[in-house]
């Protein structure tokens, strides 16, 4: 009997190794976050860090690279296998090695950028998108700014095209299409991007300063096809610092605006978004009278918006418009007991379905929301949960949903080939964790566009013992089957006549 137990444990360990190896293959375009900068500018090789996400977890690697992220600006993109291709801190563009990209990648066309090569202190000041229908090219949209005597408004939205096939696969900035001015006006800080309903083109948006007007760029296979504006009929954005953010399903949009005549007050502004027409529809603004809203992020299921002030984290339920206080800063300092406060700043919905929150100070910890699809404190917010062993300020990647395809529920915009994420067979990115487990486990998955799914669990005889519907746009579920006996089961996800299965091992001491 003892020998049998050893055999079972050995089999489980072997299966864990196999499952881990498989999960490592579940990488993608938005699976990298670069952290750290050079605290000592005379030592350009200070240790930094990189977080690589798979669909259910992450790994942190500390290493040295040239490009720092001392400010609040970060754009990066990886290939389909999760290999980092390029990044930008708003001042310059780096290749996959972290060194300067070929062909004058420095974005130094104004004095502010020239003086901040370690990274711009502007939130969401750039973003990277794939060039429509051209898998060899990418487009970096980025800000330019100058001090106006009060703050740093943005004076243009620019873009640069990168050809990843140049310089032996390290990429190069296009010699003609670099620092191209898309729009010249006065803007607030922040750029957001969302895939068009046709599944190929992109919307890129930014706020006009001291107004309620939003600019919308439609970027197609021929470059900029149109630039339009829309009045949103909301409190005007005045020297705004906001994470302009689209929901994972592309149907909602959020930003915050500061109210200058009401100190420490903000509005959270939410909208419906039509990916075909580019039109925004305004919801009722949510007033927050307890501080300036810094960070914003949607939950994976697009139902909740998380918003944070310096010392408070809120959850806004878009189904009810109810604002709930999730947490208050607990007073923890990093990296020393006397410095520095790990307060709240920018939010980031990562590829593993969790939300991470940075701090505006130079600290060595980040916060984590483990279950952002859950209501209230069940979201499980853990302050300073993750040590990163390097100094990092507030920057998080400005990743649009690269996996958002054609909206097949509408007939106005025909589906077009993207050349970026078109596959004949759907990749469900299905994972189970922990595995083995005691009957309580988490599944992560990616359903086909606008489609619901079904989870089924079968015993070794092929008998279905559990079945659950999976809503469209959901990506994570917590399953509790405490009555399952020890053994090996088959878990299957199906949608649109396609499916994927994983082995589930139940083992109770």
Regions found by a protein language model. Give the residues of each.
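Beta-propeller fold recognition
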Residues: 27-273, 277-420
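Bacterial Sec-dependent N-terminal signal peptides
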Residues: 1-31, 292-294, 304-305, 420-423, ...
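Residue-level signal for beta-strand positions within conserved beta-sheet cores that form or flank
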Residues: 22, 155, 200, 264-266, ...
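Sterically constrained small-residue positions within well-ordered secondary structures
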Residues: 17, 67, 131, 150, ...
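C-terminal outer-membrane/trafficking sorting elements
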Residues: 425-433, 437-509
């Amino acid at each position: 009997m003892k020998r049998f137990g050893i055999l079972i444990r050995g089999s489980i360990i072997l299966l864990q190794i196999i499952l881990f190896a498989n999960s490592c293959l579940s990488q993608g375009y938005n699976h990298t976050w670069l952290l750290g900068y050079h605290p000592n500018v005379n030592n350009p090789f200070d240790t930094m860090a990189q977080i690589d996400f798979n669909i259910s977890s992450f790994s942190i690697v500390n290493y040295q690279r040239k490009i720092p992220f001392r400010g609040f600006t970060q754009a990066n993109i990886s290939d389909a296998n999760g290999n980092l291709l390029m990044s930008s801190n708003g001042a310059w563009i780096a290749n996959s090695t972290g060194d300067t990209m070929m062909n004058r990648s420095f974005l130094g066309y104004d004095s502010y950028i020239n003086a901040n090569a370690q990274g711009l202190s502007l939130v969401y000041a750039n973003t990277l998108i794939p060039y429509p229908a051209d898998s060899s090219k990418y487009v970096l949209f980025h800000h330019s700014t100058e001090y106006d005597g009060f703050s740093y408004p943005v004076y243009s939205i620019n873009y640069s095209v990168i050809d990843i096939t140049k310089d032996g696969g390290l990429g190069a900035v296009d010699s003609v299409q670099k620092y191209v001015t898309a729009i010249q006006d006065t803007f607030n800080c922040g750029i957001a991007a969302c895939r068009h309903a046709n599944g190929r083109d992109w919307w890129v948006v930014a706020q006009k300063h001291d107004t309620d007007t939003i600019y919308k760029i439609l970027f197609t296979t021929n470059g900029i096809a149109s630039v339009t504006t829309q009045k949103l009929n909301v409190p005007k954005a005045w020297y705004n610092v906001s994470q302009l953010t689209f929901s994972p399903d592309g149907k909602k949009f959020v930003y915050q605006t500061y109210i200058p005549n009401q100190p420490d007050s903000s509005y959270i502004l939410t909208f419906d978004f039509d990916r075909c027409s580019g039109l925004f529809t305004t919801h009722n603004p949510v007033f927050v009278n307890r501080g300036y809203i810094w960070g914003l992020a949607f939950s994976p299921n697009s139902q909740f918006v998380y918003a944070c002030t310096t010392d408070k984290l809120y959850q806004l339920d878009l189904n009810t418009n109810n604002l709930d206080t999730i947490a208050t800063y607990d007073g923890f300092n990093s990296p020393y007991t006397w410095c520095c406060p790990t307060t709240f700043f920018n939010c980031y919905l990562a590829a593993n379905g969790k939300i991470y929150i940075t701090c505006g100070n130079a600290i060595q910890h980040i916060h984590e929301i483990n279950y952002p699809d859950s209501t209230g404190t069940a979201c499980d917010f853990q302050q300073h949960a993750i040590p990163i062993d390097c100094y990092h300020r507030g920057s998080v990647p400005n990743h649009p949903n690269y996996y958002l395809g054609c909206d097949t529920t509408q007939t106005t915009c025909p589906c077009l080939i993207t050349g970026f994420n078109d596959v004949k067979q759907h990749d469900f990115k299905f994972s189970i964790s922990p595995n083995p487990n005691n009957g309580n486990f988490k599944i992560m998955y990616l359903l086909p566009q606008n489609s619901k799914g079904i989870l089924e669990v079968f015993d070794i005889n092929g008998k279905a013992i559990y079945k659950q519907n999976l809503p469209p746009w959901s990506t994570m579920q917590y399953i509790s089957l405490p009555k399952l006996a020890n053994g090996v089961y088959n878990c299957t996800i199906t949608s649109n006549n396609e499916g994927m299965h994983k082995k589930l091992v139940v083992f109770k001491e």
